């Protein structure tokens, strides 16, 4: 039987690991935490009777070199050239407006007792920070707030993000792109 606690643990593990990968993929332990999160996700998927194979594939795959992760991250997500996939909500939803999503996220973080202004030099509506905030809400035992925040922010732009991400050519590990898309469908888009 799948308990809410098991679901929350797996979700928190995945959100936390993806947050680190979207903020600093080359950081020590980021990929290892991702592998452990995939172990938790595989367990949850198996309990739910859902395909656990994409998560399990990560467990046996060789770990990429930190420099390889950093290069691929820069190629996919940084810069302004055609094909770059933005990691901020404002890039997807507020191209011609003041980025209200940044202010809304900052307020949500502050209401939860967190301060992000200027941290890491990334906008408050960055996917990594949003996933990190979901982790905090789940750790605070407030999955309802996590779901509400997700629906108010990431759920509005992640489908377009996934479509854009899917169109990219992956130089390092193409299977990781398929896994990433599966993760978002399994955890994020059905939250």
Predicted regions and their residues:
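Charged, alpha-helix-forming regions
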Residues: 1-191
């Amino acid at each position: 039987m799948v308990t809410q606690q098991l679901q929350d643990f797996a979700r928190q593990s995945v959100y936390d690991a993806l947050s680190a990968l979207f903020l600093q993929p080359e950081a020590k332990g980021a990929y290892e935490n991702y592998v452990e999160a995939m172990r938790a996700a595989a367990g949850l998927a198996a309990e739910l009777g859902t395909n656990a194979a994409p998560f399990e594939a990560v467990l046996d795959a060789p770990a990429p070199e930190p420099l390889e992760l950093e290069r691929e991250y820069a190629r996919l997500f940084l810069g302004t050239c055609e094909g770059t996939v933005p990691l901020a909500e404002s890039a997807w939803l507020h191209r011609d407006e003041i980025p209200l999503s940044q202010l809304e996220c900052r307020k949500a973080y502050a209401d939860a007792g967190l301060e992000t202004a200027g941290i890491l030099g990334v906008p408050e509506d960055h996917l990594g920070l949003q996933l990190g905030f979901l982790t905090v809400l789940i750790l605070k035992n407030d999955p309802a707030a996590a779901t509400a925040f997700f629906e108010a922010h990431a759920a509005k732009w992640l489908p377009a993000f996934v479509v854009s991400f899917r169109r990219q050519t992956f130089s390092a590990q193409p299977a990781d792109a398929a896994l990433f898309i599966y993760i978002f469908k399994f955890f994020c888009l059905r939250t």
